[in-house]
Design a protein with these regions (language model features):
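Active-site groove signature of glycoside hydrolases
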Residues: 114-134
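Beta/alpha (TIM)-barrel catalytic core signal, keyed to glycine-rich beta->alpha loops juxtaposed to Asp/Glu
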Residues: 132, 136-329
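Acidic (Asp/Glu)-rich catalytic clusters
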Residues: 11-14, 70-79, 115-118, 147, ...
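N-terminal binding-site loop/beta-alpha segment at the start of enzyme catalytic domains
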Residues: 1-81, 331
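Short, acidic/polar
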Residues: 32-44, 100-117, 165-170
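Conserved beta-strand positions
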Residues: 22, 54, 85, 124-127, ...
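N-terminal small/glycine-rich loop or linker at the start of catalytic domains
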Residues: 12-28, 84-97, 121, 126
Length: 331
């Protein structure tokens, strides 16, 4: 585990976020039991992580319930950590108006998240996907009102295009509303174009922050899927068949598996592990505010926290070598 956590500014906001953060997707309320979840959250906090990521749809709301119970009993000062939720896919119900980005669902989902997480406000609240069925003015105003009411401090988006983010800013400018300040996109050695190219103008103005997910390509960059999906792995989790097929049945997967072996060789030459290398590579991008880690075991989380010590080993030549291997296969 690294001796000192690094902290970065979230875009152009005044919020400081740990370079590594911890997310509840897949694991909390589903893949692991509550005692393990508690150990993971405490391990993360003790290592200096101050941002815990969640969403209404994670285990249909159960992930927030588990996290909320741990936070409530932790004794941690509320000012010492950040917690998020996301709205779009729905959580506990599946009736009309229980998903999407309508004003009604966004407000109800916020109230539900506050109840499940047992907090008085959300530090970050994301529109989990764009909703083409709802006027963007409605969604922007709903976020603005939640901020004015003190239920949300900052709002952002997840997997929105640059054009959609710019459209939201234009609406907020015109209506004098609080702007989105952060985007949560997928980012790893094999998935790079949106973060590195499409969003590039947004880092300068309006000053977009990023809280990236899937730094290890849902496990592909650990090397554990080179032969088959091991028992207990994320892609072996019930309900994750869609993700397993999206990764392992995608055209060109054989070339990526071969590339992973080459990346592992570079990691070995640097005296580190492939997961640490993959995470450190993400952190080398100055436009990344934080890398969200997921883990089902304390040992796994501790291992990945060591990525902070690998950053200094990623010299310009090493970065070129990594790019030569992964770049041609990245989307």
């Amino acid at each position: 585990m690294p001796s000192t956590m690094q902290y970065r500014q979230l875009g152009k906001t005044g919020l400081k976020v740990s370079a590594l953060s911890f997310g509840a997707w897949v694991t909390f309320g589903k893949q692991i039991g509550d005692p393990v979840a508690r150990k993971l959250l405490h391990t993360a906090y003790d290592a200096g992580i101050n941002f815990f990521d969640n969403a209404e749809s994670y285990a249909d709301g159960k992930a927030e319930v588990v996290m909320g119970a741990i936070l409530k009993k932790s004794g941690w000062r509320r000012g010492s950590y950040l917690v998020s939720s996301k709205v779009f896919f729905g959580g506990e119900g599946d009736r009309p108006n229980e998903d999407g980005l309508s004003r009604k669902h966004m407000v109800e989902a916020c109230h539900d998240a506050l109840r499940r997480l047992q907090v008085d406000y959300l530090d970050l609240y994301y529109c989990h996907r764009p909703d083409p069925t709802v006027p963007i003015e409605e969604s922007c105003r709903a976020m603005h009102d939640l901020i004015v009411q003190g239920k949300v401090l900052y709002w952002g988006t997840s997997e929105w295009s640059a054009a959609q983010i710019e459209a939201a800013h234009a609406v907020c400018d015109r209506l004098h509303l609080h702007h989105p300040v952060v985007e949560q996109p997928e980012y790893n050695l094999f998935h790079r174009a949106r973060v590195e190219k499409e969003y590039a103008p947004l880092y300068r103005s309006p000053g977009l922050g990023t809280t990236i997910w899937s730094p290890l390509a849902s496990g592909l960059l650990t090397g554990k899927y080179n032969k088959a999906v091991p028992k207990g792995a994320r892609l072996d989790t019930p309900g994750m068949e869609w993700l397993r097929d999206a990764i392992l049945k995608k055209p060109g997967i054989e070339k990526k598996v071969a590339a992973v072996a080459k990346l592992a060789a570079i990691a070995k030459s640097l005296g580190t592990s492939l997961p640490r290398l993959g995470i450190a590579w993400c952190l080398r991008n100055p436009n990344i505010s934080t890398v969200i880690l997921g883990a089902s075991k304390v040992e796994q989380l501790t291992e990945n926290l060591g990525a902070l010590d690998v950053i200094e080993k990623l010299t310009p030549q090493v970065m070129r070598d990594l790019d030569a291997i992964s770049g041609p296969l990245a989307d």
